[in-house]
Amino acid sequence: MKRVVVTGMGAITPIGNSIDAFWESVKAGKIGFDRITYFDTADYKCKLAAQVKDFDAAAYMDKKAARRMEQFCQFAVAAAGEAIQDAGLDMEKEDPYRVGCAVGSGIGSLQAMEREHSRLLEKGPSRVAPMLVPLMISNMAAGNVSIAYNLKGKSINVVTACATGTNSIGEAYRTIQYGDADVMIAGGTESSITPIGIAGFSALTALSSSEDPARCSIPFDKDRSGLVMGEGSAIVVLEELEHAKQRGARIYAEVVGYGCSSDAFHITSPAEDGAGAARAMTNAVADACISPEDITYINAHGTSTHHNDLFETRAIKLAFGEHAKNIKINSTKSMVGHLLGAAGAIEFVTCVKELQEGYIHRTVGLQESEEELDLNYCKESYQGDFEYALSNSLGFGGHNASILVKKYAEG
């Protein structure tokens, strides 16, 4: 099968609206948590989120196009534009039918639904906006990215809740592996910090109860109390190796493994024994034809909920046995919160940057873990070369996905 490499990256995040800005913030241990400003939270238990700051859609697309998109699509189009530019990809020189798109969103636009539902109740059904459905549905992220950049190849929208970003990149990887595309623009996007979004997750008792930005999202810490909602987008350019070499592209890393499974257990809780998540990891490692002992770093799903962090720890132990003690594990959600459908994508680009620079970021805010959480969750950052990075995503409904990226080497 074809080899697949990463040649471009773009990001809109709570700690930076470009890959470079995001990465500098990661290395500085910057957190993106603050009081929600999109609406009045006086009646809400949760008052913190990781909002994108200073985003102006008109800086990335013309105003007319921006008005026809909800924010989750604007984030994706902006991040995709950066990724394509970063890759040096000239679409006028490409066969557009060989360039595809796999950009997912876990929810789509809650903003559009809330806005038009209010209009329905106040003014009646005849006043609901005719563009409600195409503005709201999650596949419009892939649709708008394809339209904006003339991508006429395979276009898909994966919706697997919090595993969406990882599944999107994984399915793009498979598409190129199988020879169905030369290039795929892939990733995830989300914008769900809305009244119903926060109320819904709060009703699940999934959100952090902390009002301290420094202690609200603390994966693997004994005092963790829930996730913190984030928003944004991360998009990558994946490319068939020979195609990338022929056009002289810079190669960041190589995607070498992808594994999935289903817990088939519960609609919100991961399986207690971690067997499903473990299988996704072992499938990704087997796909790369390497040994479990070759894995020395995992970017965990690490949501800062009691169950996820405990059960993911069990999954890592199940997948790697005694070797789990030798693996460095961190959670990017300690800085950006949970980006839902974009989470796996932002964590993937984090892995690529870490491989590129030989740097593993710390899990910000981690102080002390309970007894069963006895692995190395990176209280401190690490500097030094390593070859593989494994990124995990676990979604509501029992969706487990792991993707494995390798430091690029010729041969």
Predicted features along the sequence, with ranges:
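Active-site-adjacent elements of ketosynthase-type condensing enzymes
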Residues: 42-51, 108-112, 191-217, 259-279, ...
